Amino acid sequence: MKKINKSSILSLICAAVMMFSLCLIPGVKSEAAAKAPTIDKSIVMFRNSYNRTIRIKNMKKGDVITKAVPKGNDYSIVSAYTSDERYNEIWVNTFNSSKSGTTKVLVNVKRGKKTCKLSMKVKVISFVSPMQSAKIGKTNVKKAITNTADALLKKNCSGKLTIKMKKGWTITEIYQFGATGKSIKLKNNKKVNTSKGRIFITVKNKKANQIELLSLAAGY
């Protein structure tokens, strides 16, 4: 029987420790241990709303969104599509909704040979202005945006933009899109001029999980 020397035993112990350490490294996970894709449980939208981007969470390289449609392919309340811009997003809008109501958007995500089926409840309601008041200088622009998200003013106006939101609503972004094709960031309580282009205001109601895009422009 061959005698095992101390250096051989030490080498074996070191190798075992290294293998054990590799197993403890964060991020070294099997395919089965990866988190499954998920989607928001529910959202609220006004009728005739712009595209809202919905991100699919826990997407990984190689995952593909193969389907994004309203339940029963019924587009009377809401429309849904796969995104042309990002692999982990879908678009939802109510451009062509003929009625209010509640339905679901169904999404399929292919991961390897497995298909993950997701669903999100969508409640579509009639437009109610989220603004308590809105002025540009001395011009009351709130009147124009009372019944629609796309306000057409009778004439151009300039001055300080002053917007107060209703309870639960906040402004997340204001920008102006002009004839040059470039967007310019604006701020509430700062001077604006509608002759430079349409003003877009993104607002959010966190509790309802509702994000809307409002706009102001002079009539053409």
Q: Where do the model's predicted regions map?
A:
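Bacterial N-terminal signal peptides that target proteins for export
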Residues: 2-13
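Non-cleavable N-terminal signal-anchor transmembrane helices
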Residues: 6-8, 24-27, 105-107
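Sec-dependent signal peptide cleavage junction
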Residues: 22-36
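Beta-rich interaction/scaffold domains
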Residues: 33-64, 70-74, 81-160, 164-220
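Bacterial N-terminal signal peptides
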Residues: 12-25
